[in-house]
Amino acid sequence: MRVRFTPSGRRRFLDIVAYILRDNPAAARRFKQRAQTVLRRLERFPESGRVLPEFPDLPYREVVVPPYRFFYRVAGKTVWVVAVWHGAQIPQEPRLGG
């Protein structure tokens, strides 16, 4: 199983890292490392994230790297990270193509 970002998911992740980096480079590195560790775990356990409570009928799951939520979908042998949202935000319905 491979973990990949959709273009919009990658853009959002990089924007978050850049935002944190402006004020606290060490925190940005820690966040990026924690995210990589959590996402790497999905390679072996793709169903380990919880179903999105806001969209229980959709085929999306999430893993949390506080305070951010990584939304993903398993398609074949790939885990697609489709969105990254701050936990305080109300998410929009994720889309695979993003």
Report the location of each language-model feature:
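Basic, Lys/Arg-enriched alpha-helical interface segments
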Residues: 2-60, 78, 92, 96-98
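Enriched for short, Lys/Arg-rich terminal
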Residues: 65-98
